[in-house]
Curated annotation (Swiss-Prot):
One MF annotation (Gene Ontology) recorded for this entry: aldo-keto reductase (NADPH) activity
Binding residues for substrate: 124
Keyword Oxidoreductase: yes
Species: Strobilurus tenacellus
Top-level division of the source organism's lineage: Eukaryota
Keyword entries, A-Z: NADP, Oxidoreductase
Protein's UniProt name: Aldo-keto reductase str7
Binding-site residues, NADP(+): 57, 154-155, 174, 206-220, 283-291
Function: Aldo-keto reductase; part of the gene cluster that mediates the biosynthesis of strobilurin A, an antifungal polyketide that contains a key beta-methoxyacrylate toxophore that targets the complex III of the mitochondrial electron transport chain. Strobilurin biosynthesis begins with construction of benzoyl CoA by step-wise elimination of ammonia from phenylalanine by the phenylalanine ammonia-lyase str11, oxygenation by str8 and retro-Claisen reaction to form benzoic acid, which is activated to its CoA thiolester benzoyl CoA by the dedicated CoA ligase str10.
InterPro entries: AKR, Aldo-Keto_reductase, NADP_OxRdtase_dom, NADP_OxRdtase_dom_sf
Gene: str7
Length: 336
């Protein structure tokens, strides 16, 4: 059954996509602890496809995510059903956006995914050494060569987005956005304002607060030992009472809709405007189905306002990522 769609460039994609970071294997486990076998992970991808959740997000950095999706595409022959996004540029030594590396990472992603064209190719983080005009110029060459359809940026500054867009249209901005994280709305950051002005779609990653807005976690002790959420300052034990209070209030709003706190959260983000798309990830089919079910939840204006008030007043301290230094940064100026 198809989900409602929204635009990226001139393409229509499911308004609720699938983020594949959580399902990826990285070494012996994954970003969020234990990872299932390929067969079990294929079942999750099968369920996403069957539910009409056909905008899939991956990254060069996400362990075996690209390979897993590539195997699924080969196994099913359903390449034409999936709008495929991936990201490049993060290395163990830092971020790279030099032209040779852009081309190298695209070639690797095409091979891993087993496709001849990537629908949406993002720079994962801004390279603090390479002017963004040079990076996007190299990305634009990939469009000319037919290897990429649309270009995107992730966690850039408003100025970097504007400079990039002047070189080649930027179709999407991937950014963390949820009731916990409203950074892009800050007038000093001006990222939402700039994206709207330029017609850039907002793809919200971690829309469920990395799972904490679902109510599934009652304390950091609920995270598996190797779960990277243990490193996030915002999710400290001291903050959990505030986090759980937000969840309780979302649950109360959801009762009128027979909806979970997570569904209310996704519905609220989608209610921010037609330029918003969400890409929650999960390792389990039951949570995938819950996420997709948010498409049928229509909050009233009063409920949208109530969630906003909750988000603005919750004031949960701490960085949203242990590596905040790489977030929302600008790019060096192009030499004259």
């Amino acid at each position: 059954m198809p989900l409602p769609t929204r635009k990226i460039g001139q393409s229509l994609v499911s308004e609720i996509g699938f983020g594949s970071m959580g399902i990826a294997r990285l070494g012996p486990s994954g970003f969020y602890g234990v990872v299932e076998s390929d067969d079990e992970r294929f079942k999750v991808l099968d369920a996403a496809h069957a539910a009409g959740c056909t905008f899939w997000d991956s990254a060069h950095l996400y362990g075996d995510s690209e390979e897993l999706i590539g195997k699924w595409l080969k196994r099913t022959g359903k390449r034409n059903d999936i709008f495929l996004a991936t990201k490049f540029g993060i290395t163990p030594q830092g971020v790279r956006g030099d032209p040779d590396f852009v081309k190298e990472q695209c070639a690797t992603s095409l091979e891993r995914l087993g496709v001849d064209c990537i629908d949406l190719f993002y720079q994962h983080r801004v390279d603090p050494k390479t002017p963004i005009e040079i990076t996007v110029g190299a990305m634009a060459e990939l469009v000319k060569e037919g290897k990429v359809k649309y270009l995107g940026l992730s966690e850039c500054s408003a100025k970097a987005l504007r400079r990039a867009h002047a070189v080649h249209p930027i179709a999407a901005l991937q950014i963390e956005y949820s009731p916990f994280v409203l950074d892009i709305e800050d007038p000093k950051i001006a990222l939402l304002e700039t994206a709207r002005e330029l017609g850039v779609t907002i793809v919200a990653y971690s829309p469920l607060g990395r799972g904490l807005l679902t109510g599934q976690y009652k304390s950091p002790d609920d995270f598996e030992p190797n779960d990277f959420r243990r490193t996030i300052p915002k999710f400290s034990a001291d903050n959990f009472p505030k986090i759980l209070d937000v969840v309780a209030q979302l649950k109360k709003i959801g009762e009128k809709h027979n909806a979970t706190p997570g569904q209310v959260t996704l519905a609220w983000i989608l209610a921010q405007g037609p330029e918003f798309i969400v890409i929650p990830g999960t390792k389990k089919i039951k949570y995938l189905e819950e996420n997709v079910g948010a498409a049928s939840i229509k909050l009233t204006e009063e409920e949208v306002a109530a969630v906003r008030k909750l988000a603005e007043e919750s004031e949960i301290p701490g960085d949203r990522n242990a590596r905040m230094g790489a977030m929302l940064i600008d790019s060096p100026e192009l030499p004259q």
